[in-house]
Amino acid sequence: MSDATYTPPAVWTWDKESGGRFAAINRPIAGPTKEHVLPVGKHPMQLYSLGTPNGVKVTVMLEELLALGHSGAEYDAWLINIGTGDQFGSGFVDINPNSKIPALLDRSDPTPIRVFESGAILIHLAEKFGAFLPTEPAARAACLSWLMWQM
């Protein structure tokens, strides 16, 4: 029988070869790995994302707000290619220290607001524009329950 004692290393080292092609997307790194300034457009909302299920949620919300006539929901969408590591660039990490898409920079106020995680962005937009989030307690609880379920 072999020795079953496990001693964790003093410093964890990420094994770049482990996990295949997609392992690097969620690698355990804190902070940026490269300098990269994010583009900024002319609209109040700057969305940094990709067409993944979580990435698309915010785009759908912004489009629905625009359809309701909320011009403050105009946005510029910028591609964050998670396959090439864009999410680890300094500009993106400044908005989302967890290096995950989507991330939103709301520049509609004098001090820009960074919002990350799809659910947090959806709640921010719903509260900001007074749409899609009920105020009646039972309806709000049901809405938030479904929102949290999808994350």
Which residue stretches match the model-derived regions?
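GST-like domain detector, emphasizing the conserved glutathione-binding G-site
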Residues: 1-151
